[in-house]
UniProtKB/Swiss-Prot annotation:
This is Neuromedin-S. GO terms for biological process: neuropeptide signaling pathway. Belongs to the NmU family. Residues 26-64, 65-100, 101-103, 139-145 form a propeptide. Keywords: Amidation, Cleavage on pair of basic residues, Neuropeptide, Secreted, Signal. Residues 1-25 form the signal peptide. It is found in: Secreted. GO terms for cellular component: extracellular region. Implicated in the regulation of circadian rhythms through autocrine and/or paracrine actions. Its main location: secreted. InterPro entries: Neuromedin-U_amidation-site, NmS. It comes from the Eukaryota.
Protein backbone atom coordinates (compact mmCIF):
# COMPACT_ATOMS: atom_id res chain seq x y z
CA UNK A 1 0.00 0.00 0.00
CA UNK A 2 2.92 2.17 0.54
CA UNK A 3 3.61 2.21 -3.22
CA UNK A 4 0.05 3.21 -4.12
CA UNK A 5 0.35 6.40 -2.06
CA UNK A 6 3.27 7.56 -4.19
CA UNK A 7 1.55 6.66 -7.48
CA UNK A 8 -0.51 9.88 -7.83
CA UNK A 9 2.56 12.07 -7.34
CA UNK A 10 4.55 10.11 -9.93
CA UNK A 11 1.62 10.33 -12.33
CA UNK A 12 1.38 14.09 -11.80
CA UNK A 13 5.09 14.57 -12.52
CA UNK A 14 4.83 12.43 -15.65
CA UNK A 15 1.85 14.39 -16.96
CA UNK A 16 3.57 17.67 -16.21
CA UNK A 17 6.61 16.58 -18.25
CA UNK A 18 4.41 15.62 -21.16
CA UNK A 19 2.81 19.04 -21.32
CA UNK A 20 4.25 20.98 -24.19
CA UNK A 21 5.15 24.37 -22.91
CA UNK A 22 6.03 26.62 -25.86
CA UNK A 23 8.27 28.92 -23.89
CA UNK A 24 10.49 26.11 -22.65
CA UNK A 25 13.51 25.07 -24.71
CA UNK A 26 12.59 21.38 -24.86
CA UNK A 27 12.32 19.92 -28.35
CA UNK A 28 8.94 18.82 -29.62
CA UNK A 29 9.69 16.02 -32.09
CA UNK A 30 6.23 15.43 -33.54
CA UNK A 31 4.82 18.95 -33.43
CA UNK A 32 5.77 20.10 -36.97
CA UNK A 33 6.07 16.84 -38.89
CA UNK A 34 2.81 16.47 -40.74
CA UNK A 35 4.18 13.86 -43.17
CA UNK A 36 7.51 12.29 -44.14
CA UNK A 37 8.06 14.48 -47.23
CA UNK A 38 9.30 17.43 -45.20
CA UNK A 39 12.03 15.32 -43.64
CA UNK A 40 13.20 14.11 -47.06
CA UNK A 41 13.33 17.71 -48.34
CA UNK A 42 15.39 18.78 -45.34
CA UNK A 43 17.81 15.88 -45.86
CA UNK A 44 18.21 16.78 -49.53
CA UNK A 45 18.83 20.41 -48.70
CA UNK A 46 21.46 19.48 -46.10
CA UNK A 47 23.20 17.15 -48.58
CA UNK A 48 23.19 19.78 -51.33
CA UNK A 49 24.55 22.41 -48.94
CA UNK A 50 27.41 20.12 -47.91
CA UNK A 51 28.27 19.43 -51.56
CA UNK A 52 28.17 23.07 -52.54
CA UNK A 53 30.61 23.97 -49.76
CA UNK A 54 33.25 21.48 -50.95
CA UNK A 55 36.05 22.82 -53.20
CA UNK A 56 35.97 21.89 -56.84
CA UNK A 57 38.83 19.39 -56.58
CA UNK A 58 37.44 17.00 -59.17
CA UNK A 59 37.22 19.67 -61.83
CA UNK A 60 40.74 20.88 -61.09
CA UNK A 61 42.15 17.36 -61.34
CA UNK A 62 40.31 16.78 -64.61
CA UNK A 63 41.62 20.05 -66.07
CA UNK A 64 45.19 19.21 -65.05
CA UNK A 65 44.87 15.74 -66.59
CA UNK A 66 43.62 17.15 -69.89
CA UNK A 67 46.31 19.83 -69.96
CA UNK A 68 49.08 17.32 -69.33
CA UNK A 69 47.99 14.67 -71.83
CA UNK A 70 46.70 16.93 -74.60
CA UNK A 71 49.98 18.78 -75.12
CA UNK A 72 52.07 17.68 -78.07
CA UNK A 73 55.52 16.80 -76.85
CA UNK A 74 58.55 17.39 -79.04
CA UNK A 75 60.06 14.06 -80.13
CA UNK A 76 63.63 13.30 -79.11
CA UNK A 77 64.52 11.93 -82.56
CA UNK A 78 63.63 13.20 -86.03
CA UNK A 79 60.30 11.82 -87.18
CA UNK A 80 60.08 10.50 -90.72
CA UNK A 81 57.01 11.77 -92.48
CA UNK A 82 54.76 9.29 -94.21
CA UNK A 83 55.18 6.56 -91.57
CA UNK A 84 52.65 6.04 -88.81
CA UNK A 85 53.96 6.58 -85.27
CA UNK A 86 55.49 3.38 -83.93
CA UNK A 87 56.97 2.45 -80.58
CA UNK A 88 60.78 2.89 -80.54
CA UNK A 89 61.35 -0.81 -79.83
CA UNK A 90 59.47 -1.69 -83.00
CA UNK A 91 61.83 0.55 -84.97
CA UNK A 92 64.76 -1.21 -83.31
CA UNK A 93 63.38 -4.62 -84.27
CA UNK A 94 63.17 -3.55 -87.91
CA UNK A 95 66.77 -2.30 -87.82
CA UNK A 96 67.97 -5.58 -86.31
CA UNK A 97 66.16 -7.58 -88.98
CA UNK A 98 67.75 -5.45 -91.71
CA UNK A 99 71.19 -5.95 -90.16
CA UNK A 100 70.64 -9.71 -89.98
CA UNK A 101 69.65 -9.86 -93.64
CA UNK A 102 72.72 -7.81 -94.65
CA UNK A 103 75.07 -10.18 -92.82
CA UNK A 104 73.29 -13.15 -94.39
CA UNK A 105 73.75 -11.77 -97.91
CA UNK A 106 77.42 -10.92 -97.26
CA UNK A 107 78.10 -14.45 -96.08
CA UNK A 108 76.09 -15.84 -98.97
CA UNK A 109 78.23 -13.95 -101.51
CA UNK A 110 81.22 -16.10 -100.49
CA UNK A 111 79.31 -19.31 -101.10
CA UNK A 112 78.94 -20.65 -104.58
CA UNK A 113 75.74 -21.73 -106.24
CA UNK A 114 77.04 -25.30 -106.27
CA UNK A 115 76.84 -25.43 -102.46
CA UNK A 116 73.08 -24.99 -102.58
CA UNK A 117 72.48 -27.38 -105.46
CA UNK A 118 74.63 -30.35 -104.47
CA UNK A 119 72.78 -33.57 -103.84
CA UNK A 120 75.48 -35.37 -101.89
CA UNK A 121 73.84 -35.95 -98.52
CA UNK A 122 76.84 -37.73 -97.03
CA UNK A 123 78.95 -34.59 -97.18
CA UNK A 124 76.44 -32.52 -95.19
CA UNK A 125 75.87 -35.12 -92.46
CA UNK A 126 79.12 -34.26 -90.70
CA UNK A 127 78.45 -30.54 -90.34
CA UNK A 128 75.20 -28.73 -89.61
CA UNK A 129 73.80 -26.42 -92.24
CA UNK A 130 72.44 -23.09 -90.97
CA UNK A 131 70.98 -20.31 -93.04
CA UNK A 132 71.44 -17.97 -90.10
CA UNK A 133 73.92 -18.16 -87.29
CA UNK A 134 72.90 -20.22 -84.28
CA UNK A 135 70.80 -18.66 -81.55
CA UNK A 136 73.36 -19.17 -78.79
CA UNK A 137 75.65 -16.52 -80.28
CA UNK A 138 78.50 -18.74 -81.43
CA UNK A 139 79.81 -18.34 -84.95
CA UNK A 140 80.33 -21.49 -86.96
CA UNK A 141 83.70 -22.10 -88.50
CA UNK A 142 83.23 -24.33 -91.48
CA UNK A 143 87.01 -24.83 -91.69
CA UNK A 144 87.14 -26.72 -88.36
CA UNK A 145 84.60 -29.32 -89.43
Amino acid sequence: MKYLAQFPSILAIYCFCLLQIPSSGFPRPLADASDGLDIVKFEQMAYWASLSRQPKDNQDIYKRFLFHYSRTQEPAHPVKTGFPPVHPLMRLAAKLADRRMKTFWRRDSRATAADFTKKDYTATLGRPFFLFRPRNGRNLDFDTW
